[in-house]
A protein has these predicted regions:
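Bacterial N-terminal signal peptides that target proteins for export
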Residues: 4-34
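Cell wall/extracellular polymer interaction/catalysis modules
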Residues: 63-142, 146, 153-154, 167
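Composition-driven, intrinsically disordered low-complexity tracts enriched in small residues
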Residues: 54-64, 83, 261-272
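Bacterial signal peptide processing site
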Residues: 48-51
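Domain-level detector of nuclease and nuclease-like folds
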Residues: 142-272
Length: 272
């Protein structure tokens, strides 16, 4: 059972305007007693007071469901566990091999793109379907440390695959079944709302060929890539591994993110 924010605020509101002095003490006792009784009732029944600020949790958040928990150990140590091989040919790569874009693989009724926008943007405004994000603010953008406004249909905000799908294809994903490829394409651990410009200049670059201009975010960025490659069993090139180690050696205590979705999508999803 959940009490909505509107109900909770109403029950805990106090009058701030001037009131006659007579009877004030008695009213305060009653009001405080009512609030205390309500709190006791909630603790006994297991109810939650649900609050909604109308904003996302931000790109660096490690909240439940964000795909950004930190229970996986040190990121630098995890680099050594990644297999090292050469980049395979890009032959046969097609975005359709990873399923239709933004499939609802977590079955929450909203597509993956809107899930990530709700997670990473602030001041989020939704349509009446409670899924479609109409507007919000990427504040700050993790790649540039600037604020980028989001408006549905004409936005400068992209959802980046931290490990690009083409890069994944050339480093193991071409050997997977469709279910695993669809899972990677929609895993919150591998997705981030970012400024469209830097994202498009990144292309399918790996750590050896592209890093965000915002140096303060580089450790987090590389740790996320390491976490995704470890989770899905993707390999790295020698140059990529060296670049990962170089970045993470500047932040040896950087945690390895964990969480996200399962590594196989529900059977109802198909890929070309």
């Amino acid at each position: 059972m959940t009490l909505g924010a509107k109900t909770a605020v109403t029950r805990f509101s106090f009058t701030t305007g001037h009131t006659p002095e007579r009877g004030t003490a008695a009213r305060r006792v009653v009001t405080r007693g009512t609030a205390a009784a309500l709190i006791l009732l909630l603790s006994l029944t297991g109810c939650d007071i649900e609050t909604n600020t109308g904003s996302g949790t931000g790109a660096g958040a490690g909240t439940p469901g964000s795909g950004q928990g930190t229970g996986g150990g040190a990121a630098l140590a995890a680099v050594d566990a990644l297999a090292v091989k050469g980049r395979a040919p890009k032959t046969g790569y097609d975005r359709d091999q990873f399923g239709s874009p933004w499939a609802d693989t977590d079955s929450n009724g909203c597509d993956t793109r809107d899930d990530i926008l709700k997670r990473d943007l602030k001041d989020v405004r939704l349509k009446s379907d409670h899924c479609s994000v109409l507007s919000g603010s990427l504040s700050p953008d993790p790649y540039t440390d600037k604020t980028v406004a989001y408006y549905r249909g004409r936005s400068q905000v992209d959802i980046d695959h931290l490990v690009a799908l083409s890069d994944a294809w050339q480093k193991g994903a071409q050997q997977w079944d469709a279910s695993k490829r669809i899972a990677l394409a929609n895993d919150p651990l591998n997705l981030l709302a970012v400024d469209a410009g830097p994202n498009r200049s990144k292309g399918d670059g790996d750590t050896a060929t592209w890093l965000p201009a915002n140096k303060a975010f580089r450790c987090t960025y590389v740790a996320r890539q390491v976490a995704v490659k470890k989770k899905y069993g993707l390999w790295v090139t020698s140059a990529e591994k060296s670049a990962m180690s170089k970045v993470l050696s500047t932040c040896p205590n950087q945690p390895l993110p964990s969480g996200g979705n399962p590594t196989s999508a529900p059977k109802r999803f198909h890929a070309g």
